[in-house]
Amino acid sequence: MSGSNDLRIAVLGVGMMGADHVARITERIKGATVAVVNDYFIEKAEQIAAGIPGCRVIGDPLDAIADPDVDAVVLATPGPTHEKQLLACLEHGKPVMCEKPLTTDVATSLEIVKREAELGKKLIQVGFMRRFDHEYEQLKTLIDDGTFGQVLLAHCVHRNPAVPPSFDSSMIVKDSLVHEVDVTRFLFDEEITSVHILRPAANPGAPEGLQDPQIALFSTESGRHVDVEVFVTTGVAYEVRTEIVAEKGSAFIGLDVGLVRKFGTGAGNGRSGAGMSGGEITPSFKERFGQAYDVEIQRWVNAARTGAETGNYIDGPGAWDGYAAAAVCAAGVQSLETGERVAVDMVDRSSIPGAEPAERPIGPGA
């Protein structure tokens, strides 16, 4: 949805996620336009650009970032390229929405945090979209307003029908469990201090060598515990659920929508015993979190357009959140390999001047 004062965005990487963002910005986001696209496969970039009036293809991602007619950047490129591209965004003062991961290791993620802090601006937002899902927002409000008293623990489920052949056991931690890492930090507003990955019996239907499912146990600064079942080869559908348990009750999100029937013996259902049938199952993350992605990008665009007034160009998880996720996942991979509980190794946030949390912008859509 374009206009003369739109935020001109370069989308780097137009695979499944990047192409989805291009369509989102072009069709539904207000105040922004896709001005440049870039991809390793130039033909793909040209195909997408051809459908957007005035959109150009720039072959080098660093040239796309530096282009004077680009105001902001969406990074949907492979994780190993993020460090160099994020540093270029910081160098040119360009707000950037970076799909996870921030970078592929803890040290470079911390370096990104420090480099941004030195600028005195919040330019990097990380794409943890669940924070923008209405059910997670409801759960967060319930926790923060004290309705159920002190929250004690959480149970999470994260299931996928299948993964690519290249997916290995560590990627279950780094690419899937990372979302529950951010959800835990978002809901409880504190850091995770240790991770223990348990290895149940492997799914016979999983690719050879893939340890799936996995059970993750988190401990937080205040002593809360979170357990997560991650199962990425169910062969069924996409399922994400979270339950919090507190001193005065519990709350549960993630049930699929649709008619569910419970019936007893002789209910005319053609079965001999009691049971349950019906309901709909979400096929993939795009259907489950499509609205959350729209809200995420709209709020980022709003913040990026007004950031010059405050130095805060983001409205959501920032570079520190990306670093924290990397640190927890590194501990998770170590635990997967050793079978032991592993402490999360992070620097003290207060030791980095300028790395404090950004205040949420006030304005349309905020």
From Swiss-Prot:
Keyword annotations of the record: NAD, Oxidoreductase
GO molecular function terms listed in the Swiss-Prot or TrEMBL record: inositol 2-dehydrogenase (NAD+) activity; nucleotide binding
InterPro entries reported in the protein's UniProt record: Gfo-Idh-MocA_inositol_DH (IPR050424), Gfo/Idh/MocA-like_OxRdtase_N (IPR000683), GFO_IDH_MocA-like_dom (IPR055170), MI/DCI_dehydrogenase (IPR023794), NAD(P)-bd_dom_sf (IPR036291)
Keyword Oxidoreductase: yes
Catalytic activity: myo-inositol + NAD(+) = scyllo-inosose + NADH + H(+)
EC number(s) recorded for this UniProt protein: 1.1.1.18
Keyword set includes Endoplasmic reticulum: no
GO biological process, one term: inositol catabolic process
Source domain of life: Bacteria
Stated role: Involved in the oxidation of myo-inositol (MI) to 2-keto-myo-inositol (2KMI or 2-inosose).
Family affiliation: Belongs to the Gfo/Idh/MocA family.
Name of the protein this chain belongs to: Inositol 2-dehydrogenase
Organism this protein belongs to: Rhodococcus jostii (strain RHA1)
Encoding gene (name): iolG
